[in-house]
Amino acid sequence: MNKTIIREGKINLGKWFIIDATDKNLGRLASETAKTLVGKYDPLYAPNVNPKNIIVIINADKIRVTGNKKFDKFYYRHSGQVGGLTIETFNELQSRLPGRILEKAVKGILPKGPLGRELFNNLKVYAGSSHPHEAQNPVALVM
């Protein structure tokens, strides 16, 4: 008879990973990041448990996109006021808030609901190469 192993949330303390986004493709990086956050590569993967993996992405300002998406891809946000729609291109948003692009891409891939919001809090994105998480000794994640 097969036995299903059910992992409790308290057991795993999670791992810290670091990813260098220099010259990485936006979609591929976001996809691998989301899979690691969800815990798909964990031997005890369960879709309803937060594996508590924390990912630090550095050099988010050096991410690349293929084709003409730098000028043709749009990001929308609305203030809630009448006529409050703001449209920015990839290039404009990258110059203003470079980490926001990766955050939006990963958030769109993560599951929708309470667990997805909890997983998104485990993503830390920084534009430069420095970050305040050196004390956690993050493991380099090669893609």
From Swiss-Prot:
InterPro entries: Ribosomal_uL13, Ribosomal_uL13_bac-type, Ribosomal_uL13_sf. GO terms for cellular component: chloroplast; cytosolic large ribosomal subunit. Its main location: plastid. The keyword Ribonucleoprotein applies. The keyword Ribonucleoprotein applies. The gene is rpl13. This is Large ribosomal subunit protein uL13c. It comes from Guillardia theta. It is found in: Plastid, Chloroplast. Belongs to the universal ribosomal protein uL13 family. Pfam families: Ribosomal_L13. GO terms for biological process: negative regulation of translation; translation. It comes from the Eukaryota. Part of the 50S ribosomal subunit. Keywords: Chloroplast, Plastid, Ribonucleoprotein, Ribosomal protein. Coiled coil: none annotated. GO terms for molecular function: mRNA binding; structural constituent of ribosome.
